[in-house]
Swiss-Prot record:
Part of the 50S ribosomal subunit. It comes from Malacoplasma penetrans (strain HF-2) (Mycoplasma penetrans). Signal peptide: none annotated. GO terms for cellular component: cytosolic large ribosomal subunit. The keyword Ribosomal protein applies. Gene3D superfamilies: Ribosomal protein L13. PANTHER family: LARGE RIBOSOMAL SUBUNIT PROTEIN UL13M, RIBOSOMAL PROTEIN L13. This is Large ribosomal subunit protein uL13. GO terms for molecular function: mRNA binding; structural constituent of ribosome. Keywords: Ribonucleoprotein, Ribosomal protein. It comes from the Bacteria. One of its GO terms (biological process) is translation. The keyword Cell cycle does not apply.
């Protein structure tokens, strides 16, 4: 009878890879799903839910992301300062133009599990607004998404 194998922390640390995704003309939700799976390690054969077996991920050209359908005009993002009358509202178009990195970060973070492990997973995510990134020394492999 074949037994289930689990990955140890030491083995998971040895198998970390670096990936880069170009976010140009990609839909936000589809990008976030793929990114969360890579960060979590679900694309690997030896996935273990309680071990950080995911890889590092770099997302470039975040300002060229696309929201599906008419969400750029219809959806609103809200922040509150904590003071009376401190509610601020931002449209999807403004979020893409000015805060595209925070938009992608929030979408990916929302798709990770809500536990202690997710704090370690989200630290392996690097988002840049243009094509230049600081992790060239790690020789990241490029992933093409449709």
């Amino acid at each position: 009878m074949q037994k289930t194998t689990f990955v140890k922390n030491e083995a998971a640390l040895a198998n970390k890879k670096w990936y880069v995704i170009d976010a140009s003309n990609l839909i936000l939700g589809k990008l976030a799903v793929e990114a969360a799976n890579i960060l979590r390690g679900k694309n690997k054969v030896d996935f273990t839910p309680n071990v950080d077996c995911g890889d590092y991920l770099i997302i470039i050209n975040s300002d060229k992301i696309v929201l599906s359908s008419d969400k750029a005009d219809r959806e609103k993002w809200y922040t509150h300062s904590g003071y009376i009358g401190g509610l601020k509202e931002k449209s999807g178009r403004l979020m893409i133009e000015k805060y595209s990195d925070k938009l992608i970060y929030g979408a990916i973070k929302g798709m990770l599990p809500k536990n202690t492990l997710s704090r370690y997973l989200i630290k392996k995510l690097f988002i840049y607004k243009d094509a230049n990134h600081k992790q060239a020394a790690q020789k990241p492999m490029e992933i093409k998404l449709n």
